[in-house]
């Protein structure tokens, strides 16, 4: 079964998501941005979601996590929870 590790930042608006993505692409640390801005409890751990299998997260997550490039910031990804930036840190 495929497994992946990822981290994310959850915010309420697409605009905020885009602004945070620009900060990260300009050199800000993903984990620090997650700690400061993410609405998810994982933000306290730098957005780390740990390791999970296909189907354990919402469909929109799976599509990015199991097909997107590693160590790149993906998003905004819209789910029922809000807007996410995702970074896939490993995949097997």
Name each model-derived stretch.
Residues 26-31, 71:
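Glycine-centered tight-turn and secondary-structure capping sites
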Residues 1-26, 41-56, 86-92:
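Well-structured core secondary-structure elements of compact alpha/beta domains
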Residues 1-8, 60-92:
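Proteostasis/folding factors centered on peptidyl-prolyl cis-trans isomerases
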